[in-house]
């Protein structure tokens, strides 16, 4: 939590064009205190958090790395809540099988499912014997993940978080993500992916899927609040210093919204090799 808070204070301050001195003046404290917050040496007093959040133009929840409350539910919050059963079904992605072959659970390995949706892949990993954590911005998605895990007789540490605000503090053997990178604000990509890479254990795996833009493919019909597809091949370059087990680009048909459309995607399996 300390690392997340430190990064958020620094980021939101810079987004406002404030110096450490400027923020300190707003709070009637010394700039040295702000500097210590941003380096993680100390944390703000709890009583000061509301004033700090106000000065930075965010909620206390967002400052602490939790998703802020939304007046308008996200597209998938509504989809998951109103689905008859599970919006994406309960059959795991083929990517799960590839991960299983690359790093089987011969010992208790830790997995983080980033943007887990309704939990079908997270629950699959738990059933295979992995120690699984998973997060999503959708309340309904998190609750359905927990329900699916209960039904399968396994445990998934499912929690709510916003991919743009949440930063890893624990280390994992496998980072897994399908179709969520497009929600990362472009100006935050470098920082977020660097944070992810720094929290993968040696010999660990990153298994990532990202939508990419193509001039010959129309934008998807889903009205997502944040949709920032990557450039073709961009995902691979973030892991140029890891061993690339496999990477590919493909185009596929989709009818998730009830309207037939196509997507282009890049898929990456990279191993942290020291």
Residue ranges and their predicted role:
Residues 17-36:
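Short alpha-helical DNA-recognition segment
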Residues 176:
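A conserved beta-strand element that flanks and buttresses the S-adenosyl-L-methionine
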Residues 1-15:
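A short, Lys/Arg-rich alpha-helix, primarily the initiator
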Residues 67-107, 111-170, 184-191, 195, ...:
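Class I (Rossmann-like) S-adenosyl-L-methionine-dependent methyltransferase catalytic domain
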Residues 14, 25, 54:
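Alpha-helical residues within the helix-turn-helix
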Residues 179-183:
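Short catalytic micro-motifs in class I SAM-dependent methyltransferases
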Residues 47-62:
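DNA major-groove recognition helix of helix-turn-helix/homeodomain DNA-binding modules
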């Amino acid at each position: 939590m300390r690392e997340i808070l430190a990064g958020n204070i620094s980021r939101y301050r810079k987004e406002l064009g404030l110096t450490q001195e400027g923020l300190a003046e707003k709070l009637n404290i010394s700039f040295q205190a702000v500097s210590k917050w941003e380096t993680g040496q100390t944390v703000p007093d709890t009583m000061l958090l509301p004033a700090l959040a106000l000065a930075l133009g965010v909620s206390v929840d967002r400052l602490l790395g939790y998703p802020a409350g939304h007046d308008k539910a996200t597209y998938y919050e509504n989809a998951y809540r109103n689905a008859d059963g599970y919006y994406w079904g309960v059959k795991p992605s083929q990517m799960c099988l590839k991960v299983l072959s690359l790093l089987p659970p011969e010992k208790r390995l830790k997995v983080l499912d980033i943007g887990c949706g309704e939990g079908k892949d997270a629950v699959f990993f738990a059933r295979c014997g992995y120690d699984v954590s998973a997060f999503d911005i959708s309340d309904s998605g998190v609750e359905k993940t927990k329900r699916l895990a209960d039904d399968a007789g396994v445990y998934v540490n499912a929690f709510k978080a916003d991919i743009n605000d949440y930063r890893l503090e624990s280390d994992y053997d496998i980072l897994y993500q399908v179709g969520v990178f497009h929600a990362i604000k472009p100006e935050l990509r470098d920082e977020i992916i660097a944070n992810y890479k720094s929290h993968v254990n040696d010999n660990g795996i990153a298994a990532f899927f990202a939508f990419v833009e193509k001039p010959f493919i129309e934008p998807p019909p889903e009205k997502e609040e944040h949709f920032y597809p990557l450039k073709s091949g961009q995902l691979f370059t973030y892991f140029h210093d890891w061993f690339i087990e496999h990477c590919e680009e493909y185009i596929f048909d989709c009818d998730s919204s009830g309207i037939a459309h196509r997507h282009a995607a890049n898929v990456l399996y990279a191993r942290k090799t020291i």
